[in-house]
Amino acid sequence: MESTPMLDCAGRRRSPATTSSFHQALPPRNKGMRYPPDPPTVEEIVAVMRATDDRPEGVRFRGIIVVLWRAGLRISEALALNETDLDPDRGSVLVRHGKNDKRREVGMDRWAWSHLDPWLALRKELPVGRLFCIVRGPTRGRPCTSAGIRAQLHQTAAIAGVRRRFAPHQLRHAHAVEMSREGISLLVIQHADLAITSRYLRGIDSTEIIAAVHERPAPMIPADPRTAPRH
């Protein structure tokens, strides 16, 4: 027995792909795909940060970038942070539920804290909740979404002229690569893509990890062409 075809309001045959339920059962297009590391350079990351303005959304965006880049957090870990998970004096960030639900504490350098501080000041004026939240409208104070941040990274990178893939995990790769080049121990880097799993804390104290990262030198930042003196 043939099923009755779906028709639109004009009586024309309707494709199943036009129904909302059709796409709900489909996995995301990039599910299971693995992209090559190809981390962005310092110059590219800074260019993306400079492509934002000083409105609250831009200040928040720069804060998210430094947490992903200079602390090496996954996007899910960054968006799960609460204000109380940060210890600026100690230079530490507490990840309560990391990969495989593991709890860990990571360090973040002084330069990164200086770029997160403006958002921390603005965050105090918003409802209590996740560290990175929506700043306007009826959903003010609610957590940012991973999809929203990924889209903002992609769009802002295009504005900044960055032609490589610019996604949260690329910033995490950049964190690991830069620390390795700085001579920091792989035990400190704590990066799964460098074959560091649950073994990364064996034989090393968390205070040592945090101190090593907190004392990292600031990245070599190129001059901002917008503020360069004109001759």
Predicted regions and their residues:
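Conserved tyrosine-mediated DNA breakage-rejoining catalytic core shared by Y-recombinases
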Residues: 1-23, 42, 76, 80-118
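C-terminal secondary-structure termini that scaffold catalytic or DNA-interacting sites
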Residues: 1-28, 36-39, 137, 214-231
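C-terminal catalytic core of Y-nucleophile DNA break-rejoin enzymes
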Residues: 34, 38, 98-118, 129-154
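Short, basic (Lys/Arg/His-rich) helix/loop patches that form interaction surfaces
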Residues: 50-57, 106, 126-127, 150-187, ...
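Short pre-functional
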Residues: 62-74, 92-94, 177-178, 202
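A short, glycine-centered helix-capping/turn motif at helix boundaries
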Residues: 67-80, 100, 182-184, 191-192
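Catalytic-site neighborhood detector that most strongly recognizes the C-terminal catalytic loop/helix
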Residues: 97-100, 190-215
